[in-house]
């Protein structure tokens, strides 16, 4: 049986890196990053794990970059069976001061970019009558967060889009789900939580921030045959921050 191909965006660090490492050599792993150094990091990680795979540059806020990636993959006959939309950015500001580019950048990367990426790959999944699309959301989609109206709106949009896709694609054996992390120990949350770790932890019933591999384990489960009957869901992994 041929290996299934997994595409993970934002695979060089944090949750994306942990997701990559949660798979095994039964899969062909493709990771994306936004810089040459991140591509090298992904390739080094794939090699150290003794996986088969490759890495490519991708800026989800740049439509030409998305087109370049999909064209390159097609030329190499690489067709993702499992698409994991993990890459993301923050441009935090209260609405009163938020600039249009801060709003647009976050919506472009999280929502418009994912739409274009999914649209590029589902045709092959439909033809194969099998696929997995796993979108990384956030508790911000349901709780909101001061200074993150753009991020919360994008993540809520991703969850709504995923439910609609699950209805559209279910008859073709393509499952679409979201995983919504709470506060996880990553570079992105460090910017938010620096100096406030104890305060954040006090708001979480389990009393601590999560770890990237605790998100990755849920993602790899949703990508597996054990999750064949799960679609259209948002799985919250947040230590009880949102119930």
How should each PLM-predicted stretch be described?
Residues 12-13:
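Conserved glycine-rich cofactor-binding loop
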Residues 115, 122, 130, 208-237, ...:
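C-terminal substrate-recognition "lid" of short-chain dehydrogenase/reductases
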Residues 94-95, 99-107, 189, 200:
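Substrate-binding pocket helix/loop in short-chain dehydrogenase/reductase
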Residues 118, 154, 162:
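Active-site helix of classical SDR
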Residues 138:
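Residue(s) in the substrate-gating loop at a strand-loop-helix junction
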Residues 123, 167-171, 228:
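Alpha-helical segment proximal to the catalytic Tyr-Lys
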Residues 26-41:
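Conserved glycine-rich Rossmann-like NAD(P)H-binding loop of the short-chain dehydrogenase/reductase
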